Amino acid sequence: MSDTNTEKPELVSLNKLSEMRTNIGMVKRYWNPKMGFFIEPERKHNNDLLKLDLQYQALKTAYNFIKDVVKNHGQILFVGTKNDYVKKLVIDIAKRVNVAYITQRWLGGTLTNFKTLSISINKLNKLVEQQKQNANDLTKKENLLLSREIERLEKFFGGVKNLKRLPNLIVIDDPVYEKNAVLEANSLKIPVVALCNTNTNPELVDFIIPANNHQPQSTCLLMNLLADAIAEAKGFETLYAYKPDEQIQIEIPPKQERQVINRSNTRNITNQRLNINRQQQETL
């Protein structure tokens, strides 16, 4: 006789969260006192530590809420414009679970002036359709100009071109960096799910996930787990949710070395250019 009371595996283990450094906060001097409830008394080096048990509870709450939004046919928008890694991560996630995304600079009024945004989206969709239907009738120059305009619009609106109405939920990797998006969502009472580091004002976020949003492995794990809620609600395979630790493999990008500027060489080049300019003037 099979055991019908077998418990579902945990969403993600605390060991995996710790391994991915999801609980490493920012340096103490950057902390927001309103995040104090989520912070451990001790620190690691000079960084605050976030409470893993509270992080896990918050993650599960947000996960279940996202599932409910999807099951009720709500639209979800992922936002991440902070750096190249986050942009690529958000694009990959959004395409995996088929939701809208914004990875370019947040344009003021994206939510609060959605009618204007819709005009740009409609223009993009019409131009794409026009290029498909009239590709053979356009001259080479006309086709080039049309492609450039589509590329320009695609850059800013490509991720939201299927968004027919305001989203029912916004998922953000860094509410401090994406403050304008958070404030617009707040003004329209659109719920916000966000990874909140120790420098965040949690009062601006509806579903707070106290977490390290400054390191790639942490951001990758947590944002993908939130996307897995969408995948589960749609009947897709999850990437990380409910998987054993050994199946969760996250590639950590190498740190980019800082370029050291040799100021003496810079001065020499500048002086050489000045000498060349003087010589040119003397020959005139």
Swiss-Prot record:
Transmembrane segments: none annotated. The keyword Transmembrane helix does not apply. It comes from the Bacteria. GO terms for cellular component: cytosolic small ribosomal subunit. One of its GO terms (molecular function) is structural constituent of ribosome. Keywords: Ribonucleoprotein, Ribosomal protein. GO terms for biological process: translation. Signal peptide: none annotated. Belongs to the universal ribosomal protein uS2 family. NCBIfam families: rpsB_bact. This is Small ribosomal subunit protein uS2. It comes from Mycoplasma genitalium (strain ATCC 33530 / DSM 19775 / NCTC 10195 / G37).
